[in-house]
Amino acid sequence: MSEIQVVCVGVITIDTVALVDQYPHEDERVVAEEIIRAGGGPAAVAAVALSRLGIRSAIVGTIGDDADGKEVLRIFEKEKVNTSGISIGKFATAGSVIVASKKNSARAISTRQPVLQSPINENAKKLISSATWLHVDHVGIKQIAEAGITRGVGPQISFDAGYGVEDFDPSRVDLFVPTDRQMALRYPGVDLSVALENDSKKADNTVVATQGSAGSSGFSPQTGLVTASGFKVSVTSTLGAGDVFHGALIAQVIQGFELSVALRRANAVAALSCRGVDGQSMIPTTAELNAFLEANK
């Protein structure tokens, strides 16, 4: 267990994804180019991204005692993600039905969230206490105290702040990563660069905003404001790209890249993941990432 570098805590799902040219209208039938079942969930996808990039990762969350739960475990085993911190709950494994539109380069999601997260088990607590980083999503952030972790006590904390963080105190975490839309809700009418600086200086941490295909921007006390453009790839689906970015960013930080370089590399990983229908299948390895960056200097 001590070998685990990053523990990801949060939502684990099995997704059914339909790739269509354009979204159906009400009462309309469209023919999908492809329909697949794949693993999903912000924390889960980040854990897979970390593993693909050579970081020893573990996932902590709740699944059901059902066929979907068994499929979750199979996927993580294949991806070499430690699952000893997963708990088996009383309810069905969380899942989503997702329609990904090629024309719109977007996706629409209907999700069945886990009804109740099981308490963090002892294996999970041991994994977390000995890790270098703890990465949490909108569900995992609510379980930090349960794991006995606060900022400065235990691993560094990264937060995938994709939902409802208008009033979140960023000083609770070391790496605060909302979307640009969430930052606009936190700071209405304020330029993104100013908003990032405000949160970073207030919390004395690193704050990064994802900006979709435009890339990402960040601010830390050490670097000041940095920005990194996105990459153009042949997009099949953007599903999970943000979750991939979060895992990739932590991987680059662990591997010693300074913030501006880490953002550029994480942008590239997220872009390359968009070649797949689902959020996981086309996440690159570090070798593939380096080759892509070499070709796109």
Task: Describe the predicted segments one by one.
Residues 132-198, 206, 214-215:
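Conserved beta-alpha-beta core of the PfkB/ribokinase-like small-molecule kinase fold
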Residues 6, 56-57, 83-84, 157, ...:
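Hydrophobic anchor at the start of a short beta-strand
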Residues 1-4, 166, 192-297:
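Conserved phosphate-binding/catalytic region of the ribokinase-like
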Residues 48, 73-74, 197, 260:
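Alpha-helical segments flanking ligand/cofactor-binding loops in enzyme cores
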Residues 26-30, 37, 52-133, 290-297:
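Conserved N-terminal subdomain of the carbohydrate kinase-like
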Residues 50, 179, 242:
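Short, conserved phosphate/pyrophosphate- and ester-handling motifs at nucleotide-, phospho-/glycolipid
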Residues 1-60, 67-71, 234-235, 280, ...:
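Glycine-rich phosphate/adenosyl-contacting loop at the front of the ribokinase-like
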Residues 23-32, 177-180, 226-228:
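Short glycine/proline- and charge-enriched loop/turn segments
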